[in-house]
């Protein structure tokens, strides 16, 4: 059962979306890995991204949660997972690590150890899925962090900590004012799971939050204004926004290494496949469809499965092919007789004047190595997906098939040429196709 989002909160979300306009390109093109603790701040973060996804502004994010083994509350950790799993239709990565034992071994504080392990894990996940990390820091956290760093001897850089976007970490809650955060928390009835350690005076950050911050606020300190004094919201500079990448042609199909898929958990596998679909400008799989796809993958047989947008195809030994239904490889070829140019699947080739392009009829054969071989058998051996085979061009002359144009499917594969002298001119890419 999904949480409701009130109209007042939706208005705030919409206003925040406009404020983070410099990050729209990144947010819309890459999946987010959301760091979710279960507390108030990360709950707002999670619902904000849930709203963005419902509004079709972003690809489906992934929810990451780390049990630090500090709560000693297995029941609450179970509830956090059950809540996230039943409420948000996203991939989820939940992990457990004995942070107290690790901190003793490293000689660092619990906070430092937990943060280091968390970010190392988040970086690994975001790199794997070509996404970005999202955390729930806001201006009050910034004020706490300044004081914490100054107490520990920090200098000028203490004031520039927690930027909008740094080290592939995005912090959208800085676009919320403290008043807006309070309004949301008062308006909504979302489940909140507070970490018991947040109430312990054992930790310096908690003592700053409980005793120093309230004093500063009573004296008129404004965390929002202080943060803006030292941070400007700017479009992130990244290779992903270069002109070369922005003009990148969407491929006609993608292959996913079956060994990689087999090494992933169910949630990781869905996130991985959905990321590939996003690269093809397609929507993620539904839960039911993904279940059917997983069942077929586990049987290790050949199969062809489709939804409204995509063909999923695999032979017994091949990788998994993802082919959009609007892919150029599922359309008929084009032939320009004046130039003798054959075009298909975004590729093209010049052909000799004595050959005619055609589609392969059922039962057609080609003479190769002194034998007459069925073309369907060659395409099967070359692991050409079944939905593609009927559109793959051939060249014929004198009522016989002389060439199977495999290079138009994949330039790395050579054409199959019959046992006769046929002049095949070099392939070349068609600009802008």
Curated annotation (Swiss-Prot):
<dbReference type="GO" id="GO:0005737">
    <property type="term" value="C:cytoplasm"/>
</dbReference>
<dbReference type="GO" id="GO:0005524">
    <property type="term" value="F:ATP binding"/>
</dbReference>
<dbReference type="InterPro" id="IPR014729">
    <property type="entry name" value="Rossmann-like_a/b/a_fold"/>
</dbReference>
<dbReference type="GO" id="GO:0032267">
    <property type="term" value="F:tRNA(Ile)-lysidine synthase activity"/>
</dbReference>
<keyword id="KW-0067">ATP-binding</keyword>
<keyword id="KW-0436">Ligase</keyword>
<feature type="binding site">
    <location>
        <begin position="37"/>
        <end position="42"/>
    </location>
    <ligand>
        <name>ATP</name>
    </ligand>
</feature>
<keyword id="KW-0547">Nucleotide-binding</keyword>
<keyword id="KW-0963">Cytoplasm</keyword>
<dbReference type="InterPro" id="IPR012094">
    <property type="entry name" value="tRNA_Ile_lys_synt"/>
</dbReference>
<dbReference type="InterPro" id="IPR012795">
    <property type="entry name" value="tRNA_Ile_lys_synt_N"/>
</dbReference>
<protein>
    <recommendedName>
        <fullName>tRNA(Ile)-lysidine synthase</fullName>
        <ecNumber>6.3.4.19</ecNumber>
    </recommendedName>
</protein>
<comment type="similarity">
    <text>Belongs to the tRNA(Ile)-lysidine synthase family.</text>
</comment>
<dbReference type="Pfam" id="PF01171">
    <property type="entry name" value="ATP_bind_3"/>
</dbReference>
<keyword id="KW-0819">tRNA processing</keyword>
<dbReference type="GO" id="GO:0006400">
    <property type="term" value="P:tRNA modification"/>
</dbReference>
<dbReference type="InterPro" id="IPR011063">
    <property type="entry name" value="TilS/TtcA_N"/>
</dbReference>
<comment type="function">
    <text>Ligates lysine onto the cytidine present at position 34 of the AUA codon-specific tRNA(Ile) that contains the anticodon CAU, in an ATP-dependent manner. Cytidine is converted to lysidine, thus changing the amino acid specificity of the tRNA from methionine to isoleucine.</text>
</comment>
């Amino acid at each position: 059962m999904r949480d409701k989002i009130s109209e007042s909160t939706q208005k705030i979300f919409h206003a925040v979306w406009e404020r983070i306009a410099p990050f729209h390109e990144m947010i819309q093109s890459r999946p987010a890995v959301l760091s979710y603790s279960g507390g108030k701040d990360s709950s707002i973060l999670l619902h904000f991204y849930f709203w963005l996804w419902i509004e079709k502004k972003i690809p489906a994010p992934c929810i990451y949660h780390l049990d630090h083994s500090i709560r000693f509350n297995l029941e609450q950790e179970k509830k956090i997972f059950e809540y996230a799993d039943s409420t948000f239709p996203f991939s989820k990565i939940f992990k457990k690590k004995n942070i107290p034992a690790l901190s003793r071994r490293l000689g660092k504080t619990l906070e430092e150890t937990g943060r280091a392990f968390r970010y190392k894990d988040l970086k690994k996940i975001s790199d794997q899925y070509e996404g970005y990390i999202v955390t729930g820091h806001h201006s009050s956290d910034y004020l706490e962090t300044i004081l914490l760093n100054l107490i520990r001897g920090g200098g000028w850089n203490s004031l520039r900590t927690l930027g909008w976007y740094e080290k592939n970490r995005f912090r959208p809650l800085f676009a919320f004012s403290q008043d807006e955060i309070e309004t949301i928390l008062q308006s909504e009835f979302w489940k909140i799971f507070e970490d018991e350690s947040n109430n312990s005076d054992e930790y310096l950050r908690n003592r700053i939050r409980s005793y120093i911050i309230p004093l500063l606020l009573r004296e008129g300190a404004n965390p929002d204004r202080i943060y803006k004094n030292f941070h400007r919201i700017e479009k992130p500079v990244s290779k992903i926004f270069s002109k070369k990448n922005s003009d990148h042609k969407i491929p006609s199909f993608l292959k996913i290494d079956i060994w990689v898929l087999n090494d992933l958990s169910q949630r990781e596998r869905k996130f991985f496949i959905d990321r590939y679909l996003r690269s093809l400008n397609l929507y993620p799989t539904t839960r039911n469809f993904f279940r059917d796809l997983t069942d077929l993958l586990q049987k290790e047989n050949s199969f062809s499965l489709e939804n409204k947008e995509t063909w999923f195809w695999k032979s017994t030994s091949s990788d998994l092919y993802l082919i959009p239904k609007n892919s150029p490889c599922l359309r008929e070829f084009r032939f320009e007789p004046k130039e003798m140019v054959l075009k298909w699947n975004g590729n093209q080739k010049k052909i000799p004047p004595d050959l005619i392009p055609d589609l392969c009829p059922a039962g057609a054969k080609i003479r190769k190595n002194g034998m007459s071989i069925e073309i369907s058998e060659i395409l099967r051996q070359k692991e050409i997906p079944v939905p593609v085979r009927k559109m793959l061009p051939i060249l014929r002359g004198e009522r016989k098939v002389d060439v199977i144009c495999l290079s138009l499917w994949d330039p790395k594969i050579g054409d199959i040429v019959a046992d006769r002298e046929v002049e095949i001119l070099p392939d070349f890419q068609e600009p802008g196709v």
